[in-house]
Amino acid sequence: MAVKHKSESLKHEEGAAKKAKTGLLKLKKIMDIESNVVKYSICIPTTVIDNCNNLEQVTFTAYQIARTAVLFNVQEIIVLDQSKDKKHEKKSRSKETISDCLLLATLLQYFVTPPNLLDTTFKKKNKLYLKCASTFPPLNQLPFMNASAEQHYKEGLSIARDSSKGKSDDALTNLVYIGKNQIITLSNQNIPNTARVTVDTERKEVVSPIDAYKGKPLGYHVRMASTLNEVSEGYTKIVWVNSGDFHYDEELSKYHKVETKLPYIAKLKKSSTSEKPCNILLIFGKWGHLKRCFRRSDLESSSLHHYFSGQLQFPASVPQGNIPIQDSLPIALTMFQRWAS
């Protein structure tokens, strides 16, 4: 009995040693925004679909992300390939032959693609992965998703002119495909080939989508990245949102540095009336995965906590890290938009 008691005591001491002292001194900061206009981009790791067992579950997760992004007028979604940053291989989902990164990016793009351009946007070999996506309700907050609205405006894709006619510049065209085998010839414009444009079908000219749709959300752009240096160019501030880490414990010593050296953002402060947008990038995911991704990246920052402008602390009812990434999105964006208003 004495041996058993001693063994339990040692285990208790070892467990206590792994934990940092309570009452960590957490830094807080007011994030200065030198603009009156704030735009948001989000970076979603491929680990967001690690627990999905089939295509239907993957599609639903992508739809949740897309719907939130449209509701909050997110400008861009970056899909971060973290297949090299996990200690364990993901479990296979049926007979999928494309990477999680490409699958997630394809689904996210599908949900903001106008119905009349679906046939030209996606390759036939990838349409297999869209069979579940077509069953979800369209995101009707986007004006071009509603066939009955703004009838004389159409989303189109510029296509090359017949090269046999010997046009002077093959990189430019005046032809725009608007779906259902309909092609509009622009009256007095030449535009680059394979460009997504908004067309006034009555005047037969390309117009600004902001003017055409009267300031309504226009959806987001999707791109893929495999390292943090591919992610971070072009943003004014970069913020980490701790999410998707159901074993996160701030008292563990391995999280000591991030808890004490990466400040929590208390609020935003607009110090300028400039109309030049401040672009804020929110990066979601586990700290451990991001650290391994950081080591693969060619960045000037000496450590990961220097890479970020700060981190977000959710309300007390939401445990740090212990929330699915797709559920953390609306909370994070609500907090930022409230601060910026």
From Swiss-Prot:
TM ranges: none
Gene Ontology MF terms: methyltransferase activity
Localisation per UniProt entry: Nucleus, Nucleolus
Extra facts: Present with 2820 molecules/cell in log phase SD medium.
Name the UniProt record assigns to this protein: Putative methyltransferase YGR283C
Principal localisation: nucleus
Keyword Manganese tagged: no
UniProt key word Electron transport: no
Gene3D superfamilies given in the database record: 3.40.1280.10
GO cellular component: nucleolus
InterPro entries in the record: Alpha/beta_knot_MTases (IPR029028), Put_MeTrfase-C9orf114-like (IPR003750), tRNA_m1G_MTases_N (IPR029026)
Family: Belongs to the class IV-like SAM-binding methyltransferase superfamily.
Keywords: Methyltransferase, Nucleus, Transferase
GO biological process, one term: methylation
Matches recorded under SUPFAM superfamilies: alpha/beta knot
Entry EC no(s): 2.1.1.-
